[in-house]
Design a protein with these regions (language model features):
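Short, glycine/acidic-rich beta->alpha junctions
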Residues: 131, 141
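Short alpha-helix capping/helix-loop boundary micro-motifs
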Residues: 120-130
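N-terminal capping segments
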Residues: 1-92, 142-145
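Short, basic/aromatic beta-hairpin or loop at an interaction surface
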Residues: 85-120
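Loop/turn positions that initiate beta-strands
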Residues: 134-137
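Helix N-cap and loop-to-helix transition residues
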Residues: 10, 71, 111, 128-129
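Short linear sequence elements within intrinsically disordered, low-complexity coil regions
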Residues: 31-33, 103, 121-123
């Protein structure tokens, strides 16, 4: 395996981070944050349709288990904002914290669709599914969502 997997901000390192985040909770509107009651309450106020009472038990379970959460584009932004995921994985299930810098490494705070438009405006290649190159870590976007 390439040594690039150990080098932050390479596509291989990013993919390794994403793979370690598989199975962690999806909280709408979050960007690689520790699950806390304060965060849940703020997001419930900001996005009431996504934080209804039917989901509260699940959110509180995530909090009790000291998990880390993100939404789709939040995973991408969070990797950048935490300096390549520094300390994130180690904090899962513990009381450890990690640093996050809003807009870190030049990564803007945009929605999935907004990030797609931003990438196009910066000259990034894009196309249809049949033109998608087999490059680990490439973003695949459809309206309102993005995956790696």
């Amino acid at each position: 395996m390439s040594e690039r997997i150990n080098t932050p901000f390479t596509n291989e390192h990013f993919v390794a981070f994403c793979e370690k985040m598989v199975g962690l909770p999806y909280w709408y509107g979050t960007v690689v944050y520790k699950c806390t009651e304060n965060l849940r309450a703020r997001k419930a106020k900001q996005y009431p349709a996504h934080y209804g009472s039917s989901r509260t038990t699940r959110y509180r379970d995530d909090i009790a288990k000291k998990k880390v959460c993100a939404d789709c584009v939040g995973l991408i932004k969070g990797y950048q904002w935490t300096n390549g995921g520094q300390g994130v994985i180690e904090s899962i299930g513990t009381s450890k914290t990690f640093s996050s810098k809003y807009g870190g490494h030049g990564c803007p705070d945009k929605s999935a669709n907004g990030m797609f438009s931003y990438a196009k405006s910066k000259g990034c290649a894009w196309g249809t599914m049949d033109t998608l190159p087999e490059v680990p870590g490439i973003a695949l976007r459809f309206d309102g969502h993005v995956g790696v």
